[in-house]
Amino acid sequence: MTEELADNYRHIIAGLGEDPDREGLRDTPKRAAKAMQFLTQGYGQTLESLVNGAVFESQTDEMVLIKDIELYSMCEHHLLPFIGKCHIAYLPEGRVLGLSKFARIVDMYARRMQIQENLTRQIAEAVQQVTQARGVGVIIEAQHMCMMMRGVEKQNSSMKTSVMLGAFRNNLTTRQEFLTLVHG
């Protein structure tokens, strides 16, 4: 697949009026193909293999928050990156998830071509599915290169999305605690 992608990048470079055989661009198609495969490796991962049984019994029933998980993803509309951070909170119901698994879940879904709104929902639903928590809240704050580098060219703009499930959606106090912890 890398060879086919590299050939496609070679055609794109030539289509832009550049010489793909000139010194600075000679290896660019291969490098770009490898980069794209890395940036979209989430397609080859599953939630089950990623979590790998790292769900543990716990009597904890208070909110657990993992803040500032760095992420980058590819906008499905322009194939340009969006870069930001994700905050995940959940209310355990007898089980907790290994801490590193939250970052791995974020990475798995972020490393696919999509929009931020869907990414936020995918992360929330995955955490809910794995933990069977009483509630899950996810907030993503990101800057989109498709809006910063082209189109309206607004370099200081950012987008925030949230998904609230269970108690985070139905209980205003729980939602407010989450928002205060994230922004406080």
UniProtKB/Swiss-Prot annotation:
Pathway given in the UniProt record: Cofactor biosynthesis; 7,8-dihydroneopterin triphosphate biosynthesis; 7,8-dihydroneopterin triphosphate from GTP: step 1/1
GO BP annotation list: one-carbon metabolic process; tetrahydrobiopterin biosynthetic process; tetrahydrofolate biosynthetic process
Recorded coiled-coil stretches: none
Protein name as it appears in the record: GTP cyclohydrolase 1
Quaternary structure annotation from Swiss-Prot or TrEMBL: Toroid-shaped homodecamer, composed of two pentamers of five dimers.
Pfam families noted in UniProt: GTP_cyclohydroI
Leading EC class: hydrolase
Sorted UniProt keywords: GTP-binding, Hydrolase, Metal-binding, Nucleotide-binding, One-carbon metabolism, Zinc
Binding annotation for Zn(2+): 75, 78, 146
Stored HAMAP family: FolE
Domain of life: Bacteria
EC number: 3.5.4.16
GO molecular function: GTP binding; GTP cyclohydrolase I activity; zinc ion binding
InterPro entries per UniProt: GTP-CH-I_C/QueF (IPR043133), GTP-CH-I_N (IPR043134), GTP_CycHdrlase_I (IPR001474), GTP_CycHdrlase_I_CS (IPR018234), GTP_CycHdrlase_I_dom (IPR020602)
Species of origin: Chromohalobacter salexigens (strain ATCC BAA-138 / DSM 3043 / CIP 106854 / NCIMB 13768 / 1H11)
Catalytic activity of the protein: GTP + H2O = 7,8-dihydroneopterin 3'-triphosphate + formate + H(+)
